[in-house]
């Protein structure tokens, strides 16, 4: 169980919390070319020995439980911020559970259709890593402008997280 606790602590250490009420909790760890956060967890059942989670999906699993997340299939952002991991059990949550068709309707209604295609697959690992670092830097600068009080590290799980560990 100590390992599980360390995984949760490692996850929340990569989250910055906006100080304004209702602000996003931004993932500042690894970021994929699609703009979503990535988080790796050891998984002995995986061929690679670890499993990659999207950061918002991992946060939702910690908060809502794996059965609910698996049943819903999709974790959708109300805030339209792919780096937001603010999953809470109350109305202040920025993430909600839904199905694929609901997620596609929301995405189209908000004009967030994927226009960049799969060009990132043709880039080297070093190029993708450099892009990730540059994107993270731009996101943090933008977030600091959007959050009047700035950002503070969220070093531990929010009170709403029940202690469930995937």
Placement of each model-derived feature along the sequence:
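Short, cationic Gly/His-enriched loop motifs
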Residues: 49-164
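Short helix-coil boundary/hinge micro-motifs
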Residues: 1-52, 79-80, 134, 145-166
């Amino acid at each position: 169980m100590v390992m599980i606790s360390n995984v949760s602590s490692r996850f929340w250490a990569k989250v910055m919390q906006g100080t304004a009420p209702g602000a996003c909790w931004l993932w500042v760890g690894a970021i994929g070319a699609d703009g979503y956060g990535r988080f790796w967890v050891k998984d002995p059942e995986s061929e690679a020995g670890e499993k990659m989670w999207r950061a918002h999906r991992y946060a939702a699993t910690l908060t809502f439980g794996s059965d609910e997340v698996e049943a819903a299939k999709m974790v959708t952002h109300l805030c339209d911020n792919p780096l937001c991991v603010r999953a809470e059990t109350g109305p202040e949550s920025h993430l909600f559970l839904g199905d694929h068709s609901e997620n596609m309707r929301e995405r189209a209604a908000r004009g967030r259709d994927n226009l960049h295609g799969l060009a990132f697959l043709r880039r080297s690992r070093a190029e993708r890593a450099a892009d990730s670092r540059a994107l993270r830097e731009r996101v943090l600068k933008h977030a600091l402008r959007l959050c009047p009080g700035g950002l503070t590290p969220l070093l531990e799980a929010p009170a709403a997280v029940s202690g469930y560990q995937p």
